[in-house]
């Protein structure tokens, strides 16, 4: 090949390569511009938050002798949509309850640095569960813990930790409160916090860390709320509040709250005579609560809340095996669904139950007179048949030789169904244990299971003789 032919050949090859490079550059430019201007927005229904999600484009140009360009494009992945919870899945079918969590707060307090608390409860956001309690403004190994048997002081605050984490000195104090309720609507936490004088208390409504609304005492007699989780459906949260006598007629109202703002208040209606300390759960499309009648009944009141039209219906759990303490023995006790049974109705304890078709699952103290022991069981026909007493699937949670206390329900949404869980307050100290001057608690938590399970007892477990006085 002569020199002229070599020059022509090299020129032809170079021109071909240059043309290919030019076409590749145009293709890369078109791709880059298309990706840059393409809209990436995580759209959602009108009630949901709109979260823009623009792609991040990073170009790395690596130049070779042949002028080829490699471009790497990294695209941001849109975050999950933040939506209101609607709790529309069915309730899980269960055979009983399995152990879930225990915080051992009193045993750990022997080493110091753990809050004095009472009125604990559990509630979950879409990803994690938390335990709450009303602190007494002191740790147990502190002389301020003396006389903490009292319910209402200006030093009490609502504490919040991940479930299973005892309330140590680094615990967040959510608000000032001697009565409270909390729930997550899918976007943020709502806390209802009651504090102030008995005759003129204030309930503060804190949403997403900000005070949004408040309401003052309407009957001037210890405004109080659930001491367990409230429930939110499609952005509307419901909380049951009572103001008035603890042993006669009181004034109960159901508040409807949207992002911390009170949007409606409904009076209690129906046949329930006295309603306090409700344990509520989502029963789509509404909310259902099982409460404490501190006046006339040892059978528990039921409050059904319609979130759409704000209507309220109330009655009583039909099961003749009643859930409150004190109560008559099971042979003598009764309940006929509509009215209080007038059996040892004065006084009581916070508790829970939930419907399962025509049946009812429930928990109660083993003792008929005191807050000792704890058991759960199912009553066939207990939700629909007056005075039904056929008990199955009984479990002992705390044996009768150990103390219990308040108990309540919380709900956890799974992939295909909504599970019901409960906690039991394990009270220690005064009045029963007079060696010490404080009153506090730990908790144990169980959740519904469709599997098999064994037996046991899960008391507080602290040796009172090893505890600070």
From Swiss-Prot:
Its main location: virion. Its cofactor is Ca(2+). GO terms for biological process: carbohydrate metabolic process; viral budding from plasma membrane. Residues 11-33 are annotated as: Involved in apical transport and lipid raft association. Residues 1-9 are intravirion. Residues 36-88 are annotated as: Hypervariable stalk region. It catalyses: Hydrolysis of alpha-(2->3)-, alpha-(2->6)-, alpha-(2->8)- glycosidic linkages of terminal sialic acid residues in oligosaccharides, glycoproteins, glycolipids, colominic acid and synthetic substrates. Keywords: Calcium, Disulfide bond, Glycoprotein, Glycosidase, Host cell membrane, Host membrane, Hydrolase, Membrane, Metal-binding, Signal-anchor, Transmembrane, Transmembrane helix, Virion. This is Neuraminidase. It comes from Influenza A virus (strain A/Bangkok/1/1979 H3N2). The lineage of its organism: Viruses, Riboviria, Orthornavirae, Negarnaviricota, Polyploviricotina. The gene is NA.
């Amino acid at each position: 090949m002569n020199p002229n032919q070599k020059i022509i050949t090299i020129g032809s090859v170079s021109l071909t390569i240059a043309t290919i490079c030019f076409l590749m550059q145009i293709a890369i430019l078109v791709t880059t511009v298309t990706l840059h201007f393409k809209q990436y927005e995580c759209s959602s229904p009108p009630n949901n938050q709109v979260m823009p999600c623009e792609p991040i484009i990073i170009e790395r140009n690596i130049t070779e002798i042949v002028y080829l360009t490699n471009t790497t494009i990294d695209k941001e992945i849109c975050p999950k949509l933040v939506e209101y919870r609607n709790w529309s899945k069915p309730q899980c079918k269960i055979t009983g309850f399995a152990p879930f969590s225990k915080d051992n707060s009193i045993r750990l307090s022997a080493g110091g640095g753990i809050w004095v608390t009472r009125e604990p409860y559990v509630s979950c956001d879409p990803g994690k569960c938390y335990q709450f309690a009303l602190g007494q403004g002191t740790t147990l190994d502190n002389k301020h813990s003396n006389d903490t048997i009292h319910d209402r002081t200006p030093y009490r605050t609502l504490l919040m930790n991940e479930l299973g984490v005892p309330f140590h000195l680094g615990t967040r104090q959510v608000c000032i409160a001697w009565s409270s309720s909390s729930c997550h609507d899918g976007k943020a936490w709502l806390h209802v916090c009651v504090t102030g004088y008995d005759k003129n208390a204030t309930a503060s409504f804190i949403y997403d860390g900000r005070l949004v609304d408040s309401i003052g005492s309407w009957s001037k007699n210890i405004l109080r709320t659930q001491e367990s989780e409230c429930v939110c459906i499609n952005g509307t949260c419901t909380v049951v509040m009572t103001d008035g006598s603890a042993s006669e007629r009181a004034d109960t109202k159901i508040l409807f709250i949207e992002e911390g703002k009170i949007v409606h208040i409904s009076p209690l209606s129906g046949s329930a005579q006295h309603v306090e300390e409700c344990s509520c759960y989502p029963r789509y499309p509404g909310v259902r609560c099982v409460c404490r009648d501190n006046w006339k009944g040892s059978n528990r009141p039921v409050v059904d809340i319609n979130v759409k039209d704000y209507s309220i219906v109330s009655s009583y759990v039909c099961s003749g095996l009643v859930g409150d303490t004190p109560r008559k023995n099971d042979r003598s006790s009764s309940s006929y669904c509509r009215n209080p049974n007038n059996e040892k109705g004065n006084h009581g304890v916070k508790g829970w139950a939930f419907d399962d078709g025509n049946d009812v699952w429930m928990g109660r103290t083993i003792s008929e007179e005191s807050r000792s022991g704890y058991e759960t069981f199912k009553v066939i026909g207990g939700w629909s048949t007056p005075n039904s007493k056929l008990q199955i699937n009984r479990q002992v949670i705390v044996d009768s030789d150990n103390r219990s206390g308040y108990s309540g329900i919380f709900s956890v949404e799974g992939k295909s169904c909504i599970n019901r869980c409960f906690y039991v307050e394990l009270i220690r100290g005064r009045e029963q244990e007079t060696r010490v001057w404080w009153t506090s608690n730990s908790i144990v938590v169980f959740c519904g299971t469709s599997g098999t399970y064994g037996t046991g007892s899960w008391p507080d477990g602290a040796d009172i003789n090893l505890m600070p006085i």
